[in-house]
Design a protein with these regions (language model features):
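Type III/flagellar secretion export determinants
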Residues: 1-194
Length: 194
């Protein structure tokens, strides 16, 4: 992952996290399409904007009914061919062990808004792309399918279990443990005994 001015690039995608400055005239970086950082209809600022090299984009916005007690997010997906999908999702009710990409983005937005786990956006992005040699890309159909992102986060924990990566390892571990907790509370996986 390359990090520059709070703008992150993974080989197939770009995104910005909370409290980052999104360049006003961002058209491409590393041959990436522009992020949808402002909703073209409501003019709301995105919590998590993502752009893929194929021209598709996903962005998460706080819904009109959003409050800290009611963390509803509008997640929008535009594919490179102009197809569009939008869902309203309660970020606190997402089971990351059985979630679509759109649900995972709502979960990441929920984590970001509550300030825990630390660096939630980057952690969620790692769970999305995985630790495989070839990062995972999601077509619109795949973005709507259910995936086990908790297990992918566990892979990130395992691969960084080395003193050289301890800071990242601890961040991934905090996210993994929170994912296990949310999964258990939302009817999914039960917390593993360590």
């Amino acid at each position: 992952m390359h990090i520059s001015n709070n703008y992150h690039t993974i080989p197939i995608m770009s995104y910005c996290g909370k409290n980052t400055s999104i360049p006003q005239n961002l058209t491409t970086r590393a041959n990436m399409p522009a992020l949808v950082s402002t909703d073209p209809v409501t003019n709301k600022e995105a919590v998590i904007p993502i752009a893929y090299k194929d021209g598709s984009r996903m962005s998460t916005f706080r819904a009109d009914s959003y409050s800290q007690d009611n963390p509803i997010y509008t997640v929008k997906y535009w594919d490179g061919n102009g197809n569009y999908k939008e869902e309203e999702i309660d970020g606190s009710k997402v089971d990351p062990s059985n979630a679509s990409v759109l649900e995972l983005l709502a979960f990441g937005s929920y984590c970001t808004d509550r300030g825990y786990p630390e660096d939630a956006v980057s952690n969620v992005m790692m769970a999305m792309v995985g630790v495989d040699e070839e990062p995972k890309f999601y077509s619109l159909d795949e973005a709507l399918e259910k995936h086990n992102f908790t297990e992918r986060m566990k892979d990130c924990v395992d691969i960084t279990n080395n003193p050289a990566y301890m800071i990242v390892h601890l961040k991934y571990k905090a996210m993994y443990e929170f994912m296990l907790e949310r999964s258990a509370e939302n009817g999914g996986l039960k917390k593993e005994q360590e």
